[in-house]
Each structure stands twice: as structure tokens, then as C-alpha cells.
Amino acid sequence: HGHILPEPSQIPRFMKDKNLFWIDEDKKFMRQGDWSRPINSSNFFIKEKIEWMNQHRIDHAVMLCLSQLYCNGWEEQDCIDGIRFQNDFNASIQTDYPQRFTCGFVVQPRYIQHALKEIDRCVNDLGLKLLCLPSHFLNSKGEWLSTAEEDLDPIFELANKYSLAIQIHPYDGEKMIALKNKYWRFH
């Protein structure tokens, strides 16, 4: 799988203003609060991604949501707005380049009613068929819960109704899995 980053100008202003997520204007770092990660290749952006795929003879790729935009710990309205941005962005990539990309969409399990509405929107309005979920999430009490919690069965039931593929992204993998960060990378 891969990721496509939005151009800095595509990210809604509120996300940077609230320290939720942004990309520096020079495209060298993506940031969230005090966290930052270097953007070590220009092929995280659409034009360069397609050039890279052509160079390596990759016809079609699966693009997943950024784990930073799973919105863990975000207030409800920020979460709704952030997820809508991520899903609309991924849908635009899939719509503009349907022969090149299958893109995922994300929902936040903490806000289950919104999650169910967003699944409906992403499938019926945006044509997305790959649901991306975090392995665990922060509930309203600040506790980490597994996405496999029984209370979240409606998410999986709706995904099953729509025959969605589901990708579970491990959060904080380096804290849970004792593998060297040599042949793969936690992100």
C-alpha cells in the first residue's frame, strides 16, 4: 500500500490552526501538534507518485488513509471535519485516476453514529470500497479500546452489507511489536 499526501494548500485551515494536521509549505514535514515526520520523497504527492509508478511499472496501487487523520482523541466536530476532508481527498484521487488507484476511507469508532453515516456517504456518494480502521482508539473517557469491541459491531455489519474490504492499521506498532524497524516501517 501507499499514501498520497495533499498539497499544503489543500489542507483546511482549521486543521493547522488547531494543530491537528498540516504539511509545511516546502513539503519537507507533515505535522500534528508537537509531532513531525519528514517527507522523505516527493512521490508522496500525486504527480510524482504517478511518475514513480510509471518508472517502476506499477499499473495500479492501493492508497490508504493517513493514520494521523484517523482523528484519535479529536473533539467530535474536528473529527467529522477532518475525516470528511481525508475521505473527500482520497475519493478525488480515485475519481481522477480510476485506472491507477483504489483509495481507502476512514471512520472514527469513538463517534459510532457519525461513523455509520460516513460509511454510507463514502460508499454511496464517493464510490469508495476500502474501509480503513485503527487497531485501537481513544474513547470519551480517554481509554484505549480495541476496534474489535462488541459495541462496534454495527461498523462491521455495515461494511459486510456493502461488501467492503477492511484494512486495520496498527497504532503505536513499535510499542506492541518487537520487530526491528529495518525491513518495514511503523507509521
PLM regions and their residue ranges:
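Helix-coil boundary/capping segments in enzymes
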Residues: 1-187
